[in-house]
Amino acid sequence: MIDVKLNDHEKRMLQGEEGLVPRVTMEWLVEMCQIAGTDTIVDLDGTGDFHTPWTTMTFHHDFSFEELQKLVEAGGTFKIPTFSNKSPFTEMSPIHGWEGCDMCSRAHGNQRYDDCYFHKQSMHEEYYELFRKMGMLQTHSCTSYLTASYVPTIGQHCSWNESSAIPYCNAVLGARSNIDGSFATCFLGKAPYYDMHVTENRYATVLVENDRLIKSDLEWDILGFAIGEDCGLAVPAITGTAKPNTTQFCKMNAGMNTGGSIRMYHIPGSTPEAPTLEAAFGGKKPVRTMRVTESVLRATYDKLNFHTSDDVDMVYLGCPHLNAVDLMLLARKLEGKKVKIPLWIMTMPWLYNVAKEQGYLKIFEDAGAKLMDGTCMAAMGGVPDYVHNIAVDSAKQSYYITGCYPDDDNRLQVCYGTQDDCIDAAMTGKWRGDFKNIGR
């Protein structure tokens, strides 16, 4: 077993001299170091992010609510700026738009989600109140980094979660994080020193060459999933693309970390640690090359489309959560239109009021769409019972909604395509998406 190096303060916490919660979280940290194969702990100087109280408290740590309360009363705080990830429907979220979403029978038998008492009880608000006192900013989003107004800078050590977020932290911001965001890392301000915290592990090993100039949102989405499947845990350097915008970064990141487990990549000239292709590889040669041909993109598109009927029951947009510009552009597309089938639009709570103030919420409501926030369909317990064919514009959502919550008869099917394809489906109830549309 690895003997993890500890300073005097860490030893005191591990021995229980500073209370139960510090001891339990230090035990967890030491065990994580041993699992990761490192004897070193890194002090965090960036930001942290973790999922909801129920998930964190139940699976990560063995102490009671009362012990946490004692810690807070004694002045315990998170040691780094800490944000909350999206929430399962049965706890805190959606903050807005959950009423009448036809999910009442899911996961809790006959207990209705629109029962206000049940909803408040299920929020675990007592944990969130303590977390607020400890300094948590409750963004309730998979893309907290887009609304936090405070992001880590290049080289800072962080502790994040979420598929689109980890590559964003490492590749786009140039900060450093593994997939280990938790109460423990944020409370201690410490994490195991391995993988993306180590400079040598951040250099590219696989060269990705694109035959087609990647420039549209869906092309980036498909490319991300394809690279993830091919590269797995490797660090790719990607060539043959236009310069991605924020939305396209998020879509590719989510696809990469769904099709595979890519925490880091480089796009020479677009990401901060790769001013050149040579710099991306740290002066070394690629181990191998991945060639992204038209047939690779087509095969990935077809894999994410699995439906035998063109009749669509529901459309879902907002995986990852839509940012402010996404909401503005979507409002332009929906203004003056009327949906024929349910259209759910998901964003983060801090942007819901922005959408309301800017008039986007009214446009969505007038169109018959539902703006929701703080969660996602994969965290809500699946789809409403009437949905057997859903249209999405996200590789991640296509993958997770059927993988996490297959229905009893395995009848849930997915139509995957551009946002415009999805809007057309919402207006007509029919799927008319096609691979030829992906460049639009």
Predicted segments — roles?
Residues M1-R440:
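Non-transmembrane, aqueous-exposed alpha-helical and coiled segments at domain scale
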